[in-house]
């Protein structure tokens, strides 16, 4: 029996009681694996969450999609996009836009998720791709930012590459859900990219990621074994081929 699809209210009731699991998914195969494994939350691109097979393979995964403020230039753009995504099967909208945009969406009852700490689309303002809130002053500023997101109506924020003690204290002080990517176990969810877990990352693997399998290496090994089998004649074998009766074969040869 398929598990029931979780709601924002369900996730909120688990705050402080259970660490949720969260993945960035980009394919139907990853979505099916996440559903089978019992993953709680997924961040998925728009083209995946709107795929006609997505909810068939991941019916119970709470699924967030979104665009950055660089892609949605106005609050109305975000609202229009959010409506399309929720109608297609998304459960929440990621928004890296302003607090005014967050508030605008929340007033229209859109379940909206913000982003604090290292935010790739805004990294130039925090010194590039590096940790945030490593000083008392910057940690206080981060807390104030999270509180502002809560006041604006966001139900959650991704909190990325922040010292764990800072993230844990913010989580204690606020009702806002904190989804941790490199911010420690004191948050409400642990968030990794599927490609990092599966060993399929191109280039640098972030420090906060953990590689559980080496699919990239295994894929190359499988292809190399196929190449060697073809060269040696080990492939194809009889079980890979269609049989023909001897009588029909002889008739063909004599024809």
What are these regions (language model features)?
Residues 1-255:
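Alpha/beta enzyme core
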């Amino acid at each position: 029996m398929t598990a029931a699809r979780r709601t924002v209210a369900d996730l909120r009731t688990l705050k402080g009681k259970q660490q949720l699991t969260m993945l960035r998914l980009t394919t139907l195969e990853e979505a099916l694996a996440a559903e089978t494994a019992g993953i709680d939350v997924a961040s998925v691109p728009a083209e995946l969450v709107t795929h006609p097979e997505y909810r068939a393979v991941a019916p119970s995964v709470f699924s967030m999609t979104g665009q950055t403020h660089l892609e949605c230039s106005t609050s109305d753009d975000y609202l229009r996009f959010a409506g399309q995504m929720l109608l297609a099967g998304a459960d929440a909208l990621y928004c890296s836009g302003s607090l005014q945009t967050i508030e605008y969406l929340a007033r229209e009852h859109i379940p909206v998720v913000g982003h604090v700490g290292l935010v790739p689309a805004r990294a130039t303002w925090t010194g590039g791709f590096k940790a945030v809130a490593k000083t008392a002053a910057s940690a206080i500023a981060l807390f104030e930012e999270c509180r502002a997101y809560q006041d604006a109506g966001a139900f959650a924020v991704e909190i990325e590459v922040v010292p764990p003690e800072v993230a844990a204290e913010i989580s204690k002080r606020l009702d806002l859900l904190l989804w941790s990517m490199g911010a420690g176990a004191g948050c409400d969810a642990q968030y990794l990219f599927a490609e990092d877990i599966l060993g399929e990352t191109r280039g640098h693997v972030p420090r906060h990621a953990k590689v559980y399998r080496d699919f990239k290496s295994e894929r190359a090994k499988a292809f190399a074994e196929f190449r060697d089998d073809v060269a040696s004649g080990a492939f194809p074998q009889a079980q890979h081929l269609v049989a023909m009766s001897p009588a029909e074969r002889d008739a063909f040869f004599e024809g």
